[in-house]
């Protein structure tokens, strides 16, 4: 909160589970496009071969939005794990203009593509903890 950024985080795990990249939200500098998942997807696409990324996992606090799902798909990342649904996020953010959500599950975005992206989430054991980071923020 002190950084001026929104409470989201993402990381890229390699096939062996090693954390390769991580990022928070960069709203302060990048406004609406500085989502943690997009930051990781852009860095991953620059740093790694598509064949390697197909075996990697994007782990994110909240279900990727449409933009982040597209970025993940185009970067070639093969798997997504998220903690809390975007629908639950919308309940926490309301109509805050800094985080207007779209009711579009990431699976629908990935299912429209020609390449399979596996999705795991939400993670019920983490949802309340993730939600606490948003309480009072919006």
Language-model region placement:
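Short beta->alpha transition motifs characteristic of CBS
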Residues: 20-27
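A structural motif shared across PLP-dependent enzymes of the aminotransferase-like
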Residues: 14, 31-37, 122
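Zinc-dependent deaminase
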Residues: 1-3, 71-138
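Residue-level recognition of the N-termini of beta-strands and the immediately preceding loop/turn
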Residues: 8, 54-56, 117
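Short loop/turn motifs at secondary-structure junctions
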Residues: 6, 52-54, 76
